[in-house]
């Protein structure tokens, strides 16, 4: 009865959005079929990239507190929400205010707490794959019900094109003058794009650390399958990606890994270099050094117009630091995108573990990041976000 009721609501709703969380990754085949039959735009969480191919017209990319132009558009304008294996957290639903026009929710989840998070919910509790297969079999044979949904899907597709155009513009920035470095250096979005393209070319797994690298990372990646990227957005443990490289030396079927980390996150656990060499890991750690906690700096700038105590005056030569560990191949990247490409090639050909030190820009130049498109219940935004939350239907 709940399955049939869910299908009826999906077929009759003109603007359906699916929030695909980390719990949907193992069931991406069922999800792709379900999205087609539901006529739904699909919004990803930071940890679920790849459940839809990057160029799939239904893939609106990430949506949440950081989000994207297309992902947050779909969240803000949908009237029916289908949650699949997702938790209601800031980077997923904008601290509870990400769906202002949604009237009803269908929640497919294995966790009862997540299943019942929203009001006005039909809860489908159990194995996500089994539930999706049953729903897929329950849709009408005729596709006439999809016709009224086309205007919605076209509007979402227009926003996807807008997002991709914006990414291309920001990621092609050659260099911005940085006061700390005293010269033009790559922006983080431009540098991360180069590394992600390299990883895709060599079918390497990407591991993203917490902070600014993480945020720019999940907005950048162009995954076509789950497992191409792992990003620790659940708790944002600094040092996660560096430690993850160790797994290459311990896995039965190792795959080349590339850890993308900031200077602060790397320093949380440089001991991982020793463990990686000890276990024979083969991979690469790319340190994007902006001499500060840039994620917090940008949040302070947005809320107060000034950053406070998020940087230091101590320069660290991370290539020298890493090269002190025997078995580590360390590189300093001097220059722009071409130099980064060249160094990535050299590091990839090295046997064992490689570490790249990449200096990147930090500051208020709008090209330094990929933007924030949602709400966040933090700092001096709390009162307004909570007022909105209490007024929501769901």
Range-by-range predicted roles:
Residues 2-16, 75-77, 194-202, 249-255, ...:
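Glycine-rich phosphate/diphosphate-binding loops that line cofactor/substrate pockets in enzymes
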Residues 22-24, 48-49, 86-89, 111-113, ...:
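Short glycine-rich anion-binding loops that position phosphate/pyrophosphate groups of nucleotides
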Residues 65, 72, 77, 115-116, ...:
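Thiamine diphosphate
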Residues 48-160, 285, 300, 344:
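Glycine-rich, acidic loop regions that bind phosphate or pyrophosphate groups
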Residues 1-9, 175-178, 381:
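Conformationally flexible catalytic loops at phosphate/diphosphate-handling active centers
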Residues 157-252:
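Active-site diphosphate/adenylate-binding microenvironment
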Residues 33-39, 93-112, 226, 368-385:
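A short, gly/pro- and small-residue-rich
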């Amino acid at each position: 009865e709940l399955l049939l009721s869910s299908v009826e609501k999906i077929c009759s709703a003109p603007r359906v959005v699916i929030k695909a969380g980390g719990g949907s990754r193992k069931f991406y085949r069922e999800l792709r079929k379900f999205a087609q039959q539901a006529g739904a735009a699909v919004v990803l969480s930071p940890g679920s990239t790849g459940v839809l191919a990057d160029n799939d017209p239904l893939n609106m990319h990430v949506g949440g507190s950081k989000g994207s132009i297309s992902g947050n558009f779909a969240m803000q304008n949908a009237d029916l929400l289908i949650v699949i294996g997702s938790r209601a957290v800031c980077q997923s639903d904008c601290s509870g205010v990400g769906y202002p026009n949604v009237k009803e929710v269908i929640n497919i989840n294995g966790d009862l707490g997540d299943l019942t998070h929203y009001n006005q919910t039909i809860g489908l509790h159990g194995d996500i794959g089994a539930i999706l297969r049953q729903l897929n079999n329950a849709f009408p044979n005729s596709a006439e019900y999809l016709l009224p949904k086309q205007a919605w899907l076209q509007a979402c597709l227009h926003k996807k094109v807008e997002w991709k155009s914006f990414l291309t513009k920001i990621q092609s920035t050659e260099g911005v003058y940085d006061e700390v470095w005293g010269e033009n250096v790559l922006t983080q979005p431009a540098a991360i794009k180069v590394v992600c393209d390299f990883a895709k070319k060599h079918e390497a797994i990407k591991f993203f650390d917490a902070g600014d690298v993480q945020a720019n990372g999940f907005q950048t990646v162009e995954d076509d399958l789950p497992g191409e990227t792992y990003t620790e957005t659940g708790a944002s443990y600094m040092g996660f990606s560096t430690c993850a490289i160790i797994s290459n030396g311990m896995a039965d079927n190792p795959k080349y890994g590339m850890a993308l980390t900031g200077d602060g996150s790397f320093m949380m656990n440089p001991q991982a270099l020793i463990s990686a060499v000890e276990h024979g890991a083969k991979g690469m750690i790319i340190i994007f050094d902006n001499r500060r906690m840039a994620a917090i700096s940008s949040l302070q700038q947005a809320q107060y117009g000034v950053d406070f105590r998020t940087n230091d005056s101590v320069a660290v030569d991370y290539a020298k630091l890493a090269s002190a560990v025997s078995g580590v191949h360390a590189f300093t990247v001097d220059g722009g995108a071409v130099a980064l490409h060249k160094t990535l090639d050299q590091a990839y050909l090295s046997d064992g573990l490689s570490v790249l030190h990449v200096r990147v820009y930090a500051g208020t130049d709008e090209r330094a990041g990929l933007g924030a498109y949602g709400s966040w219940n933090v700092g001096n935004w709390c009162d307004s976000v909570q007022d909105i939350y209490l007024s929501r239907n769901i």
